[in-house]
Amino acid sequence: MNIEELYRTYFDIVYRYIRSVSRDGALAEEVTQETFFKALKKADQFRGDCDVRVWLCQIAKNTLYDHLKKQKKQLSGEEQPETAESHGGEIFEEKLAQRSQAMEIHKVLHGLSEPYKEVFSLRTFGELNFREIGMLFGKSENWARVTYYRARVKIREELEHEDHM
């Protein structure tokens, strides 16, 4: 598979994964582009012992972490600016309610500890199967299933707790 095919086939998956972890569309775009650049440079190092998606998501995760470390050094203790996406047009109540619920889920998700947050994101947004997630972490498929299930339970409990407040 050449780089163009790789890019067309996996761009969306890598982008959605990084977007779900970072919650920043511009950053996700930048990291995804850099991921494919790194993948091109390191294509000869791909051993084929895991799915290409797993390999690309691992590169993307490391690239994101590198980017965040670099950004943290640049900000040197300053509060990181929040990014807000502007949405044009009229938003109907139903869409607003769905978005509000999605934001609540994202808030709870990003409050989870690792590896729950990442496993949930890889499964839900990165569309990786449990075997691939296990390989990414150097763990078993069963570990990935249990971790995902526990993340779902934690998210559900936190959302129910917030509803009762």
Give the location of each predicted region.
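Structural recognition of an alpha-helix C-terminal capping motif at a helix-to-coil junction
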Residues: 30-37, 50-62
